Amino acid sequence: MVVSLSFPEADPALSSPGAQQLHQDEAQVVVELTANDKPSLSWECPQGPGCGLQNTGNSCYLNAALQCLTHTPPLADYMLSQEYSQTCCSPEGCKMCAMEAHVTQSLLHSHSGDVMKPSQILTSAFHKHQQEDAHEFLMFTLETMHESCLQVHRQSEPTSEDSSPIHDIFGGLWRSQIKCLHCQGTSDTYDRFLDVPLDISSAQSVNQALWDTEKSEELRGENAYYCGRCRQKMPASKTLHIHSAPKVLLLVLKRFSAFMGNKLDRKVSYPEFLDLKPYLSQPTGGPLPYALYAVLVHEGATCHSGHYFSYVKAGHGKWYKMDDTKVTSCDVTSVLNENAYVLFYVQQTDLKEVSIDMPEGRIHEVLDPEYQLKKSRRKKHKKKSPCTEDVGEPSKNREKKATKETSLGEGKVLQEKNHKKAGQKHENTKLVPQEQNHQKLGQKHRNNEILPQEQNHQKTGQSLRNTEGELDLPADAIVIHLPRSIANWGRDTPDKVNQPWHNADRLLTSQDLVNTGQLCRQEGRRRSKKGKNKNKQGQKLLLVR
């Protein structure tokens, strides 16, 4: 259903001439509404920063909190739609209607530099013209807005559950699990929350504080747990996890003591993008990304003194410092360097549609704390196989090609002809360890009386031993490196594979020979006698010792 909505005339006392002119020229706002619409998580239309707020006397704490709520994307969109005021039966004194008018006036009916005064409906029940805790005012405002919604729902639907747009946006579920250490039985309890308090007494970062929240607590002695299965008090462990993540996450850094109000003024780092998945009771699927959009800051020694201000991210993506009537632009670096009191994050379920964009290609790098560790492990364990089967055509697909007889003399001529082409490749190939092994093998071969073979090499004018690693023969030649005494191979070189042809591809590194697929099979059976190497018709075997 498509509904055309127009905003009512603003209060002249709170509107500047420029704002009135803007309202006269403003077109109607069209939004799509359905019966079961959920609050949007992003700005429907990019908006600039809201106007400054007048300090009526020690009211900086409520101004800072109202600015954060005004720039909460799903709440602002719901307020700008004016959906609630159209169904409210008693708009006078209604906190939801007052907040709707405040957000509409701040974002739509004001010019840059305008200042407005917060409605007394939002402030009178809490503000007594003295400094108060901004977080307490924030939670008081959300609870009273929630109650206003429930009154309307109960009048229209008496059987409806205690749900409201406020809980749909800010609400989540805690899961408290108690486990009996004797019978291992568990008991789960679920509680709603609107904010997540974080103990920062020993935490260096928000992520560490979130982990500390989930630490197991032992229940013993007077605090022992009564187990229904054991039917008596037993030692138990208690853990607390976020079971259902809210659309908007409020993280409250516990800087003030409960009794004296003294402040814990220590630096706690917080990210611009946060992945909440590791902190859920049942983490499944991919990352659960959140983006920072507002920060509430306190300067001073106690919560009842000092000064409050806030940073907000406007609908068009720019950051602003909201300090009562002053609205100044800033960068995200300034925002992340503050000693924050309350952090506001919005869930990003669809990165392509959310206005507070996070680089989609860097999501795992930014959000997943284990991504870099997993990436480094994959690189460490990924090793390239020394086998040459990955070069050229796979062995199972290679065709058996006919070969012709080639003499050593012809091989020498062809080698010298192609030596220049293959020289560059051989210079870049590290064969020093192989050449040392070949020298050792050569000494063993001499001890096994293979002088006739060496004399034959001298007659042909070619020293195969000096050309190991750079022998370049025609594609139809077959070269076999076969030591005379195979039985002594494993005992003489225990660090090598006990198959001489296993290293044949290391002895000949010429790319041309590898691509022909005519090297001897590495997986072949071990041959113990030289006489078994018989020449097939049309082939010339070169036995290299």
Swiss-Prot record:
<keyword id="KW-0256">Endoplasmic reticulum</keyword>
<dbReference type="GO" id="GO:0016579">
    <property type="term" value="P:protein deubiquitination"/>
</dbReference>
<dbReference type="GO" id="GO:0004843">
    <property type="term" value="F:cysteine-type deubiquitinase activity"/>
</dbReference>
<dbReference type="InterPro" id="IPR001394">
    <property type="entry name" value="Peptidase_C19_UCH"/>
</dbReference>
<dbReference type="InterPro" id="IPR050164">
    <property type="entry name" value="Peptidase_C19"/>
</dbReference>
<feature type="compositionally biased region" description="Basic residues">
    <location>
        <begin position="374"/>
        <end position="385"/>
    </location>
</feature>
<feature type="active site" description="Proton acceptor">
    <location>
        <position position="307"/>
    </location>
</feature>
<dbReference type="InterPro" id="IPR018200">
    <property type="entry name" value="USP_CS"/>
</dbReference>
<keyword id="KW-0833">Ubl conjugation pathway</keyword>
<feature type="region of interest" description="Disordered">
    <location>
        <begin position="367"/>
        <end position="443"/>
    </location>
</feature>
<keyword id="KW-0788">Thiol protease</keyword>
<feature type="compositionally biased region" description="Basic and acidic residues">
    <location>
        <begin position="393"/>
        <end position="404"/>
    </location>
</feature>
<feature type="active site" description="Nucleophile">
    <location>
        <position position="60"/>
    </location>
</feature>
<dbReference type="GO" id="GO:0006508">
    <property type="term" value="P:proteolysis"/>
</dbReference>
<feature type="domain" description="USP">
    <location>
        <begin position="51"/>
        <end position="348"/>
    </location>
</feature>
<dbReference type="GO" id="GO:0005634">
    <property type="term" value="C:nucleus"/>
</dbReference>
<keyword id="KW-0645">Protease</keyword>
<dbReference type="Pfam" id="PF00443">
    <property type="entry name" value="UCH"/>
</dbReference>
<dbReference type="InterPro" id="IPR038765">
    <property type="entry name" value="Papain-like_cys_pep_sf"/>
</dbReference>
<dbReference type="InterPro" id="IPR028889">
    <property type="entry name" value="USP_dom"/>
</dbReference>
<keyword id="KW-0378">Hydrolase</keyword>
<protein>
    <recommendedName>
        <fullName>Ubiquitin carboxyl-terminal hydrolase 17-like protein D</fullName>
        <ecNumber>3.4.19.12</ecNumber>
    </recommendedName>
</protein>
<feature type="region of interest" description="Disordered">
    <location>
        <begin position="521"/>
        <end position="545"/>
    </location>
</feature>
<dbReference type="GO" id="GO:0005783">
    <property type="term" value="C:endoplasmic reticulum"/>
</dbReference>
<comment type="function">
    <text>Deubiquitinating enzyme that removes conjugated ubiquitin from specific proteins to regulate different cellular processes that may include cell proliferation, progression through the cell cycle, apoptosis, cell migration, and the cellular response to viral infection.</text>
</comment>
<feature type="compositionally biased region" description="Basic residues">
    <location>
        <begin position="524"/>
        <end position="537"/>
    </location>
</feature>
<comment type="similarity">
    <text>Belongs to the peptidase C19 family. USP17 subfamily.</text>
</comment>
<keyword id="KW-0539">Nucleus</keyword>
